[in-house]
């Protein structure tokens, strides 16, 4: 579906919905399809936001960190393989630290969506400008 459009930027915020093994299994094939169908498109990878209840749910906190590490590793490997238009955004400051950005430590509230959007906006804007050159 994405390859039927002509986007300037693709924002990849999928980490909350995949495991590290799923990421490793599928990312290179996905990237080759995007590169083939939409050459030159800017791609922004975004980490899973920190899990605010990690101190109480160690398993979930570890899963988030493992997923983010898998994304960082995949990003580095894709860059080494020659994918040029890749960008990476750490998520540690996107939601703030007051605990008001999620309903349950994971799913965003209206405030969480607002903070997330405001956090990624400058990066996406810069990538759109870069793509328009």
Residue ranges and their predicted role:
Residues 1-42, 48-55:
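Oxyanion-hole/transition-state-stabilizing segment in secreted/luminal serine hydrolases
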Residues 13-22, 58-66, 103-111:
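The substrate-binding groove and active-site-proximal loops of carbohydrate-active enzymes
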């Amino acid at each position: 579906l994405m390859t039927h459009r002509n986007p300037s930027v693709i924002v990849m915020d999928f980490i909350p919905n995949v495991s590290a093994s799923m990421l490793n299994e599928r990312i290179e094939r996905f990237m080759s399809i995007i590169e083939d169908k939409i050459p030159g498109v800017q791609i922004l990878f975004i980490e899973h936001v920190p899990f605010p209840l990690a101190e109480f749910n160690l398993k979930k906190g570890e899963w988030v960190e493992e997923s983010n590490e898998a994304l960082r590793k995949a990003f580095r490997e894709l860059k080494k393989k020659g994918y040029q238009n890749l960008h990476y955004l750490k998520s540690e400051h996107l939601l703030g630290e007051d605990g008001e950005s999620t309903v349950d430590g994971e799913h965003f509230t209206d405030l969480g969506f607002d903070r997330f959007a405001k956090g990624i906006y400058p990066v996406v804007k810069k990538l759109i400008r870069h793509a328009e050159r």
